[in-house]
Amino acid sequence: MKSFTTSFTTGLKSLLRRIEMKRRKFIISAASTIPAITLFPSDLSGITRETVRGKLEKRSLGKTGEMLSVIGFGGIVVMNATPDDASARVRMAIDAGVNYFDVAPSYGDAEIKLGPALEPFRKDIFLACKTTERTKEGSRRELEQSLKNMRTEHFDLYQHHAVTTLEDVDTLLGPGGAMETFLEARKEGKIRFIGFSAHSVEAAMALMERFEFDTILFPFNYATWNAGNFGPQVMARAKEKNMGILALKAMAKGPWPDGADRSAFPKCWYEPLITEEDITMGLRFTLSHPVTAAIPPGDEKLFKQALSLAHNLKPLDQKEVNSIREKALKGVPLFKS
């Protein structure tokens, strides 16, 4: 557990350094001309919603025709769990109405634990996976291994994982790049939809300009949005293209302060929101935008809180929007544009 956590945290810190070190002016007119999405009270235009008493709300996923639960299950929740615990956590999520599960090879043993636990429910859920491999050969190898680990013949969504720089974009979309695997696998029936996750505005905007993706997985968070101007331009473009919008970091407070005790949340490389009031605020902010689903942190306790609180979310009114903005401006956002 300790060695993986150290490696996981180190890798994410490295990713953030790359964003800062390689950030450069991004000359795509859309990035500078698309305005931020107006802050509601509620901006869910274009989203179809389904509600069933006692279950999580479901929302439409862009142009895919799929309906996903507003809370997704991140594979890190079962990382290092026993098989019995993994099955229990999956069952808990299913019983709450979760039908969206997301995993990646970089999440330690999560695939190996999640695959058997999900097998009885496979036909009823939407399964997403990702690869950090940028080449055709590497991504094909990782795709086939992930399918084997997850005990499935196909993924509903396969994503380019953590795309950070324009060099990443050029490589994965270029000759011999990972996109060649994605397109071949879609023809083979091994993946249904193609998406990406990103942690930089420039990479996200570049990808959306150069390929017709089905989905985007991106940090849409009250603090990064208001204090970092990180997210509005990406969401506006994704909505314009009728992409399925999936959210990371809805429950992030910001970077861990220097010297902070992180022992209570070893799977969180950022400081999470932990009180019921703050978690509710974070989820309400993110899900009041045209977001289909939010993936909570991989910590089991926080995931359970998200499941509980997401059943009773109400739209934000303008007074609350203003209050959240003031709160965000007092803190340090996890990402900045």
Predicted regions and their residues:
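Short, acidic/polar
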Residues: 80-93, 136-150, 199-206, 279-282
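Active-site groove signature of glycoside hydrolases
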Residues: 150-168
